[in-house]
């Protein structure tokens, strides 16, 4: 892959939602992905159009925008999913896989899954000093 280090830097800077969705897949599948599997899934999702990436500008803040979160999760699990945006007050029910959207200032946002201890960043100002401003709730279609 050309500019591999820049790609990884961009994933680290902008890829929190992608990585949270893959964490949902890990929880559902009952196994952790290794780095090569994560990279392969991310590149496949970009090629399929589920995730945006600008190969002409690795610092584009729209990189790793998830157009189709349900399809990304399907790619990683082999199952079909729905996803809904919910308010922070939403109480999850059995079968829900929840991703939290955090913000400390109302502008910068970060996705994490603190309910199961997952945060793609070692330290996140949004999580440390912010609050949950939204949820993404995934459910498997049976």
Can you annotate each of these PLM segments?
Residues 1-12, 126-130, 139-142:
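Flexible propeptides and autoinhibitory/regulatory segments associated with cysteine proteases
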Residues 25-141:
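Conserved active-site-adjacent core of cysteine acyl-enzyme catalytic domains
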Residues 20-24:
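Stable alpha-helical structural segments in soluble proteins, enriched in small hydrophobic residues
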Residues 10-11, 15, 19, 32-33:
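Soluble non-cytosolic domains of exported or imported proteins
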């Amino acid at each position: 892959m050309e500019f591999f280090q820049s790609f990884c830097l961009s994933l680290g800077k902008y890829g929190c939602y992608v990585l949270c969705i893959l964490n949902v897949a890990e929880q559902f599948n009952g196994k952790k992905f290794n780095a090569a599997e994560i990279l392969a899934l991310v590149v496949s999702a970009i090629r399929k159009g589920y995730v945006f990436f600008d190969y002409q500008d690795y610092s584009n803040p729209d990189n790793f925008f998830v157009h189709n979160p349900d399809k990304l999760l399907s790619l990683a699990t082999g199952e079909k999913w729905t996803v809904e945006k919910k308010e922070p007050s939403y109480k999850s029910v059995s079968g829900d896989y929840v991703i939290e959207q955090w913000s400390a200032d109302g502008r910068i946002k970060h996705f994490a899954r603190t309910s199961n201890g997952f945060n793609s960043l070692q330290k996140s100002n949004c999580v440390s000093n912010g609050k949950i401003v939204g949820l993404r709730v995934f459910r498997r279609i049976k």
